[in-house]
Amino acid sequence: MASAMVCCARLGWRARYVGRFGSDELGDIGRTSLTNEGVDVSAAEVVAGAQTRFAMIIVDGRTGDRTVLWDRDPRLALSAADVPAAAVRTSRILLVDCDDVEASVAAATVAREAGVITAIDVEAVLPGLDRLLPLIDIVIASEGFPERWTASSETGRALERLHAELQPALTCVTLGPQGSLARCGGREIRTPAFRVPCVDTTGAGDAFRGGFIAALLQHGPEDVDVLLRMANAVAALKCRTAGAREGLPHAAELEALLAEDTRGTGVPQ
């Protein structure tokens, strides 16, 4: 989530992170790194005595694929009462994840009432998602989620069923080197990935979501193909460099890739 906000900030948009840090050195580093990237952390809380979430990432040097090992201090969890409603109401787009489903439900409810666009980063089938997902305008799922949610074995059919059930403006699944597959209205849109040297895929999903949000802010919702192409380009550029954020592009880098490579054009079905 934090990396998606950094992505938006690098592409020229104001971004705010809502969450919790521990009162440790890693927490100080995390807050400072976001502030240095131009992300507003005024709505983020420091929890006394808690340890900041830490992950160990193992990267396959041949493919750039990664395995993530992590643990989270339960004191970092957000409840519905912890949601800063004023910060949500003054946003243009709210992106939530599923770390704290009740908090995400509360935030999405406030956003809906205020006319704020809602988006979600969803990976796993969790308790409470049946209440959260209907509040979402833009569903961006990780590979495998549509199949798990719908008990359908084929990705395209699973995404179609997910979209029909939830009826958001857009339902999308990221597919790594295969790009993305989305449904918007009655259309299925396959967007190929951009071909770049892949060093590390860590954070590619955050990059895709941040790239999509930045594209939506820039271009509006009319041409979904353009938004998906930009999101795929941002994710590809991130994978050039090790680390979750180091490769996140600035606007000039993104524009250069979009100008030189036309293979990420959406293919409507």
Language-model features: where?
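Conserved N-terminal subdomain of the carbohydrate kinase-like
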Residues: 10-92, 255-269
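Conserved donor sugar-nucleotide recognition element shared by glycan-biosynthetic enzymes
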Residues: 1-4, 26
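Glycine- and other small-residue-rich loops at beta-strand/loop junctions that grip anionic moieties
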Residues: 19, 96-97, 121-122
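Active-site glycine-rich loop that binds ribose-phosphate moieties when present
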Residues: 75-84, 102, 120-128
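Conserved phosphate-binding/catalytic region of the ribokinase-like
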Residues: 154-269
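Alpha-helix C-terminal capping segments
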Residues: 5-14, 215-218
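Conserved phosphate/ATP/ADP-binding segment of small-molecule kinases
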Residues: 105-190
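Aromatic/hydrophobic pocket-lining residues that form π-stacking "cages" and hydrophobic walls in ligand
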Residues: 4-5, 30, 104-109
